[in-house]
């Protein structure tokens, strides 16, 4: 099925949010699975709300997620002549007509229909008047008066709409601009789109678009409407649920493969498998496993999944990824140094911001180590500082200052003085780290180096 063509068509009226990102991922995976094409189209016909900064942000988010597209980027704002040519074709064939009813009169018609318990719609006053162009006039589709529209949705199964409930929708506004449904149908048809996967908030547009496909003589694509993503409380997802725009997740320190993996699982499944490499998703993705029930967004699970990917990433690659976050903490460190540190600390972080912060005490000079007051009071007592001084002497005497040497020096001090490890280690740890936590003490000492470790111990003894 190399003839499969899918598309993603965001409006540049805001940053790419996770619902839109999931739609893009589904369409990208379907195209890549069948060796087809994935088209990216910017729906910027709303000139007042569309902003270049949002277009740039959407494109950057797509690239960050690894969603490449085929062919040129399409802008609807550059295709008005094409849309108008198809509107003219509909007028010539009798499938559309000019309407001069002002908006307030149309709204009055809708109110009258509501009062009668009917679907609010335009009453077709201008359908048979044979009007032509004129100021304030719009072009409407001449929809069939009766019948049903039935299609096989890839997610929902058979879906039917009564044509009598549909409006004679506007195709060209009074200012000459084409409307959303007209532009979408013309674009999808002329770009050869075969499959349209989108959120089920678009389901009500589908019968209108099918009427346009039929009026223009275009072949219908396969439609699939995936349920919206809900919050943990099963209400519409919003920022209060912890949902962010894709660009915010990047700034927050998530890895793109984690976000892609998580969003795919919010609406698609392959048995009980939770973790997928991108290549696996391309291989296994299919519309038959798209879920018809809405999934709930769980920020904790996303954090857990991102932590998994942090720990699976090579030290060199993870160092490259965390470098800008370390720089944001105020440190000028090269990636080779970070590649030594991240294996010790990635178990203690679930995102790159956390990873940069938990490594902070390893990057500051001895004079700037921040001491936790409670840890100092508990561990750096007079006896504790005496043990720190003793360990300091043992470390200073080492010929080779490496992990094994540091471990032996501490062990020899403990054994030589008839002590237990727990009597010595907490004080030395607080002296080196500034707190009780952290990875293995000898590992950290070896990475800090002799001079830095001795300076930290000297400072702690002097407290």
Curated annotation (Swiss-Prot):
Its EC number is 6.1.1.17. Gene3D superfamilies: 1.10.10.350, HUPs. One of its GO terms (biological process) is glutamyl-tRNA aminoacylation. It is found in: Cytoplasm. It catalyses: tRNA(Glu) + L-glutamate + ATP = L-glutamyl-tRNA(Glu) + AMP + diphosphate. A motif ('KMSKS' region) lies at residues 236-240. Signal peptide: none annotated. Keywords: Aminoacyl-tRNA synthetase, ATP-binding, Cytoplasm, Ligase, Nucleotide-binding, Protein biosynthesis. It holds the Pfam family Anticodon_2. It is an enzyme of class 6 (ligase). One of its GO terms (cellular component) is cytosol. A motif ('HIGH' region) lies at residues 10-20. GO terms for molecular function: ATP binding; glutamate-tRNA ligase activity; tRNA binding; zinc ion binding. ATP binds at residue 239. The keyword Ligase applies. PANTHER family: GLUTAMATE--TRNA LIGASE, GLUTAMATE--TRNA LIGASE, MITOCHONDRIAL-RELATED. Belongs to the class-I aminoacyl-tRNA synthetase family. Glutamate--tRNA ligase type 1 subfamily. Catalyzes the attachment of glutamate to tRNA(Glu) in a two-step reaction: glutamate is first activated by ATP to form Glu-AMP and then transferred to the acceptor end of tRNA(Glu). HAMAP family: Glu_tRNA_synth_type1. Monomer. This is Glutamate--tRNA ligase. It comes from Nitratidesulfovibrio vulgaris (strain ATCC 29579 / DSM 644 / CCUG 34227 / NCIMB 8303 / VKM B-1760 / Hildenborough) (Desulfovibrio vulgaris).
